[in-house]
């Protein structure tokens, strides 16, 4: 083989190796999330991405970021294929989410131009280790909110439910916790590079820093003590048939399952002293406010326990006047307080419907590509009311509950709104029947555990099929029902009024990260536009740090 041919073959092998490393680091990152929940794999996965992006040009950074994203999101979001019954939606959402990491790869190659060159022995690694996490978390913030409400699944924070870093969530929420994990990964990447280059002192410093970042948050104190007494709640998991779509097509089957479980609760004696019974999202397959038979069934359950029942129901309505892009009838996802003897009362309406799961943006355009969009016959619209429901206990106290339905558990701001409006416990009704056999329910439970710490509140998660669980304000699961069974849990849940530091800060950590990321990318792009070396002494373009081979 001639020398030019050998060089070309070596270049191909090198690029293929980079792609495989990018995909592999994405797969490693996925292992940090449920069901495996190997939290320590998260910083290692981030370190792998940082390593393959070192010194690359923008185009290579985009490709490698995309490869990492595909390795990460393909297994993480497989539950969408289970829900939709086909792989088209799964592949589409995987590609969309992976494009965000492609943008991250490109943005980081631009921002690296600001990093001091080889002459700055310590400053270069330090700047890289600090700047990369800012870009990572900024991308998380964007993809968790845009477009159409975003998709927060896969945020680094949600892999930390069992990690020693979890207490940091009480100080800075998912944003700060994710920033710490990404920082740990970036520090590890610098340590690996230093080890390869024989810089033992730098390797030791990076290893020590990574350990300190991982262990020190465990020293943060987490309040758990009740501040306003307790409330005894019963979480009812009625279960559905193996084929969820078929179960909901048989009128009132799901409702009857939850009525039976509630009646069993009352007959067992476990309902003694219970203040509230919580049913899951969509537990009433017909709206009891409109359907008389359903109302009779729900009233039967409420009378059996003698306390209010929180009922999940779908309300249908005519399309609001002046609303474009929505055709025909619309839906609202409600949780209704049903009091025995007086019926429906307060209502919480879901604020964050899931794009392509509960409503279809650009329906006419997408229908031209796939008729699958019409599986969602009517769009679910967001609610505009408050984020809390108030229930009266047996001893006459009015207790406000912060509510987040299903995927809303993954949105810090939705639950924060409920807590800041006075919610003393967080209630998460969810319907996981469409995800049977997938990792979605386990991921959602991990999200609930992180949110318990973020907001300093106990979380009661109630599912049609599981996972139904009670979570302490420290993020510990204190009770859990066996999935895919008719079951109930009874727990005395602490009521808390104080606001965590994370809730006091609100959206500001995310805003600061987004602003910093914007500055980094714009500043990194400026030298390239000007065709000049950055003005700061010793700073050179990233491609000059080492020979660029991709």
Predicted regions and their residues:
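Membrane-embedded alpha-helical bundles of multi-pass enzymes
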Residues: 2-221, 437, 448-451, 463-474, ...
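Intrinsically disordered, low-complexity coil segments
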Residues: 9, 13, 112-127, 196-202, ...
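Soluble catalytic domains of enzymes that build or remodel membrane lipids, polysaccharides, and related
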Residues: 221-505, 509
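Juxtamembrane interface at the cytosolic side of transmembrane helices
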Residues: 519-550
């Amino acid at each position: 083989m001639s020398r030019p041919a050998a060089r070309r073959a070596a270049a191909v092998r090198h690029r293929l190796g980079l792609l495989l490393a990018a995909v592999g680091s994405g797969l490693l990152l996925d292992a940090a999330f449920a069901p495996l929940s190997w939290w320590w794999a998260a910083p290692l996965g981030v370190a792998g991405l940082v390593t393959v992006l070192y010194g690359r040009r923008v185009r290579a950074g985009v490709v490698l970021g995309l490869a990492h994203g595909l390795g990460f999101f393909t297994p993480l979001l497989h539950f969408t294929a289970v829900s939709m019954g086909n792989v088209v939606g799964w592949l589409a959402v995987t590609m969309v989410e992976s494009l965000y990491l492609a943008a991250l790869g490109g943005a980081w190659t631009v921002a690296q131009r600001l990093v001091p060159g080889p002459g700055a022995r310590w400053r270069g690694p330090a700047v890289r280790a600090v700047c990369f996490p800012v870009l990572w978390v900024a991308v998380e913030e964007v993809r968790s909110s845009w477009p159409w409400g975003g998709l927060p699944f896969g945020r680094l924070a949600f892999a930390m439910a069992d990690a020693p870093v979890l207490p940091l969530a009480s100080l800075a929420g998912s944003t700060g916790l994710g920033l710490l994990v990404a920082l740990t990964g970036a520090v590890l990447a610098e340590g690996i590079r230093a080890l390869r280059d024989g810089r033992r002192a730098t390797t030791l410093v990076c290893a020590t820093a990574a350990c300190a970042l991982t262990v020190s948050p465990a020293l943060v104190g987490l309040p758990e003590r009740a501040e306003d007494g307790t409330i005894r709640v019963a979480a009812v998991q009625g279960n559905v048939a193996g084929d969820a779509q078929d179960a909901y097509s048989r009128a009132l089957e799901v409702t009857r399952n939850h009525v039976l479980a509630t009646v069993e609760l009352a007959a067992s004696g476990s309902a003694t002293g219970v203040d509230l019974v919580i049913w899951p999202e969509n537990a009433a397959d017909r709206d009891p406010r409109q359907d008389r038979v359903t109302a009779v069934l729900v009233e039967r359950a409420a009378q059996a326990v003698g306390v209010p029942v929180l009922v999940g129901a779908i309300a249908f309505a005519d399309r609001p006047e002046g609303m474009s892009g929505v055709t025909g009838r619309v839906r609202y996802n409600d949780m209704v307080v049903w009091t025995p003897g007086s019926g429906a009362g307060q209502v919480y309406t879901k604020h964050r419907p899931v794009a392509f799961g509960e409503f279809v943006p650009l329906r006419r355009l997408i229908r031209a590509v796939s008729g699958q969009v019409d599986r969602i016959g009517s769009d679910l619209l967001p609610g505009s009311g408050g984020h809390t429901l108030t229930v009266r206990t047996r001893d006459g106290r009015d207790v406000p509950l912060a509510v987040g339905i299903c995927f809303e558990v993954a949105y810090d701001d939705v639950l924060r709104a409920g807590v800041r409006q006075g919610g003393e416990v967080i209630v998460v009704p969810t319907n996981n029947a469409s995800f049977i056999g997938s990792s979605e329910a386990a991921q959602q439970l991990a999200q609930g555990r992180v949110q318990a710490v973020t907001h300093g509140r106990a979380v009661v998660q109630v599912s049609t099929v599981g996972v139904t669980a009670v979570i302490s304000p420290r993020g510990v699961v204190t009770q859990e029902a066996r999935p895919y069974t008719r079951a109930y849990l009874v727990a005395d849940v602490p009521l808390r009024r104080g606001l965590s530091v994370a809730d006091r800060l609100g959206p500001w950590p995310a805003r600061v990260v987004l602003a910093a990321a914007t500055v980094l990318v714009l500043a990194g792009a400026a030298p390239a536009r000007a065709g000049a070396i950055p003005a700061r002494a010793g700073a050179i373009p990233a491609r000059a740090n080492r020979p660029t081979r991709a």
